[in-house]
Amino acid sequence: MDSLDSLFSLRGRRGLVTGASSGLGVECAKALAIAGADIALVARRKDRVTRIAAELAKTHGVKAIGIGADVTREDDLDRLMAETSAALGDVDILVNNAGVSPTGRAENFKREAWDEAIAVNLTAPMMLAQRVARRLIETGQPGRIINMVSIYASVASSVYRLSAYAATKAALANLTRQLAVEWAGYGILVNAIAPGWIPTEATEGGIAKPGNKGRMEAFTPMKRLGLPHEIRGAVIFLASAASSYVTGSVISVDGGYQAW
C-alpha cells in the first residue's frame, strides 16, 4: 500500500447499495463508482435507479445496474442478489442505506409504523448482510458491510419525535458491532456511518419547518448543515484498503454534533 490509489481504489470490486434512488443512497453509489467499483443500485423505484445507474456507468466507466426491489420481502432479496451476481459478480461491498423515519408522539405512535421501521431499518439490513456474508464465507473472499445509521443512534432528537427511527438505528449500530465480531475471522469488516443533519429529499420537509434549520445549525459545532456529497469520503474509506484494520466502528459525519 505505497500509493494513494492502492489505498482507496475500488477497481475490481462489486458494490450493492440499497435505498439508492435518492438522497444519501445516490451519494453512496456515486462514492463507490468514483473509486472504480461496479455497482448495483436497489430501490423500490426501479425507473429512478435504472436512470441513475446509467448515468454513473457513463460518467465513471464502471458497470452499474438498477434493480427494483422491496428490501422487506425475502423473495426480493433473493432476486436482487441473483440479478447482481449475474450482471456483476458476487457482491463484496454492501451499503445498507434504505430506511424510513416515521414521526409521531411516542404515546400515540401507531403499531403499523413501528413495525415498518423495524422491518426496513433493522430486519432488512440483517437479512441482506446475511446473504452477502454467506456467499463471501462460502467463496473465502473478504468483504465490507457498511450500515447507515444516524446521530440518533446514540442521542435523542430534540427537533423531531423519532422514537421508532432512533430505536431502530441504535439497534442497527449495535448489530454492526456484533456482526463485526462474528465475521472478522472471515475478513468481512462491518462498520457504520452516522450522518448528521444533511438536507435530502427525505429530510428537506422537516428542515424547512419554521425554526428547525436555525436550531440544527445552532446545535452543530460547525454551524451549518451537511452537504449530501460529504458522505462520500466515509463510504470510500470504509469500502477500501484504507480501513483494513477498522471493524465494529461507527463513523460520525455530523459537523461535530456528537462531540458536544
Residues covered by each model-derived region:
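Substrate-binding pocket helix/loop in short-chain dehydrogenase/reductase
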Residues: 105-106, 110-118, 216
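Short, small/polar-rich loop/turn modules that mediate ligand/substrate recognition or access, typified
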Residues: 95, 184, 189, 246-248
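Conserved glycine-rich cofactor-binding loop
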Residues: 21-23
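Short C-terminal tail/terminal secondary-structure segment
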Residues: 2-7, 236, 247-260
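Active-site helix of classical SDR
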Residues: 129, 168, 176
